């Protein structure tokens, strides 16, 4: 079953482009099981990284693996709390449809 994860990041003022580029560069060689991802800049100046995974297993392998995206960008972001530089959401895709 396909999986989607969304990471919400609040870049420090003026650093959204740098954060975006670090994410893009860190994924340049691909990530096993990641079908596609989008980076959205919201009106509230947040970055949303929307990841589409081939399966829950692929997502869990990434989460439990040696990835370093957060470590790469945390110095450019405002913290949500003492421990977290982002908010993360994930779940299985229960409906998907292409628009006409």
Which residue ranges define each predicted feature?
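Short, surface-exposed ligand-recognition loops at beta-strand->loop->(often short) alpha-helix junctions
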Residues: 8-21
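Active-site-flanking beta-strand signature of metal-NTP-handling nucleotidyl enzymes
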Residues: 2-10, 48-50
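An amphipathic, aromatic/His-enriched active-site/gating alpha helix that lines ligand/cofactor pockets
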Residues: 28-37, 52-87
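Non-catalytic surface loops within mature trypsin-like serine protease
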Residues: 11-13, 55, 95
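Short, low-order "capping/linker" segments at domain edges
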Residues: 89-100
């Amino acid at each position: 079953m396909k999986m989607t994860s969304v990471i919400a990041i609040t870049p420090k003022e003026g650093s959204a482009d740098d954060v975006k580029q670090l994410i893009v560069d860190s994924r340049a060689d691909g990530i096993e099981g990641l079908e596609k991802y989008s980076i959205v800049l919201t009106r509230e100046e947040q970055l949303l990284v929307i990841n589409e995974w081939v399966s829950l297993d692929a997502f869990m392998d990434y989460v439990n693996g040696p990835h370093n995206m957060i470590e790469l960008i945390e110095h450019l972001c405002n913290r949500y709390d003492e421990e977290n530089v982002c908010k993360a959401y994930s779940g299985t895709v229960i409906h998907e449809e292409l628009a006409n």
